[in-house]
Amino acid sequence: MLLHIPTILSRTQATSMQERLAAANWTDGRETVGPQGAQVKHNLQLPETSPLRQELGHEILDALARSPLYFAATLPLRTLPPRFNRYQENHQYGFHVDGAVMSLPVAPDHTPASLRSDISCTLFLNDPDEYEGGELIIADTYGEHEIKLPAGDLIIYPSTSLHRVAPVTRGMRIASFFWVQSLVRQATHRHQLLELDTAIQSLTASNTDHNTILRLTNIYHNLLREWSET
């Protein structure tokens, strides 16, 4: 399921992040990928140990927690802390697939933890007219989809998808990216639950008979109970 979620960040929040990132120290993005990815990845990335990465990451996680649509679409169990990248002129990232299992930050009790990447997320931090090129291109069974969204908007898509970032030919593209392990492993099941949840919300807003809404809500939770992994 490819889904555009508008205004995760307000204009003020996105601008503030841009300003703080402008003064940051960036590193070669190839340092965070394996040999295959390094052959096609040409961008800059905020270091994992950067205090700014942690600060902005917390702000993004707080914003995501305030979005009912994000929660309904992802049903998050675990989230990798947001990372940040920058594409300048001639930067690009060729077709690649995200790793299936990723390490989470070490817990206070030093217990190792990992995340299964079910959903890939890109949060755009500057507007499309500030750069040329730089489209996120996602390939699926229906072809290739070009994504280039306003600052503060989020795109989510299955981590099983091949995807790339087109070459930037003018300006600079700044974004945050992260992965989610969902309570519901299968993308088709998540899509069905989102459609059902959306229908329930619409019927509730239109003052439909309470018993009808209750029956649909019962179906939703029983499906979630059957499909979820905790």
Swiss-Prot record:
Protein name: PKHD-type hydroxylase Xfasm12_1709
SUPFAM superfamilies the UniProt entry points to: Clavaminate synthase-like
Keyword Oxidoreductase annotated: yes
Cofactor: Fe(2+); L-ascorbate
Note on how the cofactor is bound: Binds 1 Fe(2+) ion per subunit.
Lineage top rank: taxon: Bacteria
Domain Fe2OG dioxygenase per the UniProt entry, residue ranges: 78-182
Any one biological process term the GO annotation gives: DNA damage response
Residues the entry annotates as binding Fe cation: 96, 98, 163
GO molecular function: 2-oxoglutarate-dependent dioxygenase activity; iron ion binding; L-ascorbic acid binding
Keyword field: Dioxygenase, Iron, Metal-binding, Oxidoreductase, Vitamin C
Positions that bind 2-oxoglutarate: 173
SMART domains in the cross-refs: P4Hc (SM00702)
